[in-house]
């Protein structure tokens, strides 16, 4: 019945949504802005106003559901709770992640780490920036934010990989993995001394010092969420921004001529290709939304990628325009009570990484033999961003 009532949604395949979703999302947004997707076994929301409505109404569209895969791996957290429980888990982290607090704590360390990574690749004249800059920078910053310097970035990445693989296995219909359990237990053990340090030592130590009744285990569960979001989406955010700019010489030239445009260029990149393309909610009751008969318990998938290209809000929505006046109206960081708590840190990392690249590698360009193409159903970024430049002359 649902497939017959929503034929465009019924036609959409996982392969389309993973490789090149935007033509499909455009058709759905125009004709079936909320559509039943058999491929996703849920309702897909593609129009911006409806996406915002769902994200801003946790009483009707909740994250608090046993099917939420992240909660099965790391336990309850601000990501998987709503209402008073969500506020209790999120509140201790709100202060340390304020814009002013992030700038004061991280501006210099992020710049230093970006320069260190660029120093390592500069003499070669070529690099794969996702794995040699974007990912390592995101991982290093998260390591510092969580106070895990003693463990080291490589160890933290190992835990991250195990936790992500377990979440992915659950999403695909499997069970939590033993490796994921061990990864989370290792993170928990490493967090214990980090949480006992003075609040100035890390963002999570600051949150633990103002935990407002959160148990240590609950703080660790939220730290695992920050680990996941701080690496996966920030890496994608940086990789996508570099790819968007370097693929469009006119836009790159505008940013080089007017560096202040980079702030808006990052927002425009987030709009055009959000690193997190979809978010899940679950209907708490029967409800009709834009004519769609949603039943309590149904999965409701908000397409951030679809909302961000809504022509009712963004003129020429498929174009990348660093001067777009309303680029910041994107929903890449979600909306409502679950708006991304780490967005200020992610923006700082992306802006710093791209700015330092453009400043230090003056003729930075894409490798013509390897054009980056974003892919991914949930998290979208290019597999590789291969670039080249003229190596700096050796010091005399």
Which role does the model predict for each range below?
Residues 1-396:
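Cytochrome P450
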């Amino acid at each position: 019945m649902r497939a017959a009532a929503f034929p465009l949604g019924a036609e959409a395949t996982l392969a389309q949504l993973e490789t090149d979703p935007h033509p499909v999302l455009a058709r759905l947004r125009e004709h079936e802005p909320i559509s039943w997707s058999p491929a996703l076994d849920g309702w897909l929301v593609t129009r911006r106003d409806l996406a915002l409505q769902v994200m801003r109404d946790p009483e009707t569209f909740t994250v608090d559901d046993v099917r939420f895969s992240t909660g099965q791996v790391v336990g309850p957290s601000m990501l998987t709770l709503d209402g008073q429980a969500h506020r209790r888990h999120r509140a201790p982290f709100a202060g340390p992640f304020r814009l002013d607090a992030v700038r004061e704590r991280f501006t210099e360390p992020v710049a230093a780490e970006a320069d260190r990574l660029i120093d390592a690749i500069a003499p070669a004249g070529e690099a794969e920036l996702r794995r040699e800059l974007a990912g390592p920078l995101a991982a290093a910053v998260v390591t510092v934010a969580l106070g895990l310097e003693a463990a080291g970035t490589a160890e933290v990445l190992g835990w991250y990989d195990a936790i992500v693989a377990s979440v992915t296995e659950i999403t695909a219909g499997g069970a939590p993995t033993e490796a994921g359990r061990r990864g989370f237990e290792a993170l928990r053990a490493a967090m214990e001394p980090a949480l006992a340090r003075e609040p100035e030592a890390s963002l999570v130590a600051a949150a633990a010092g103002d935990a407002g009744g959160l148990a240590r285990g609950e703080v660790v569960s939220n730290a695992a969420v920050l680990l996941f979001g701080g690496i996966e989406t920030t890496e994608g955010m940086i990789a996508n921004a570099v790819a968007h700019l370097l693929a469009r010489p006119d836009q790159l030239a505008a940013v080089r001529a007017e560096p202040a445009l980079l702030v808006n260029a990052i927002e425009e990149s987030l709009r055009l290709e959000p690193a997190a393309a979809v978010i899940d909610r679950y209907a708490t009751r029967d409800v009709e939304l834009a004519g769609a008969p949603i039943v309590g318990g149904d999965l409701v998938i908000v397409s951030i990628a679809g909302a961000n290209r809504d022509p009712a809000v963004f003129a020429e929505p498929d174009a990348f325009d660093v001067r777009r006046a309303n680029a910041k109206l994107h929903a890449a960081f979600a909306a409502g009570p679950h708006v991304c708590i780490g967005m200020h840190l992610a923006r700082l990392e992306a802006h710093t990484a791209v700015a330092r690249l453009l400043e230090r590698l003056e003729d930075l360009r894409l490798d013509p033999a390897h054009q980056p193409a974003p892919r991914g159903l949930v998290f979208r970024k290019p597999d590789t961003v291969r670039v080249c430049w003229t190596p700096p002359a050796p010091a005399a």
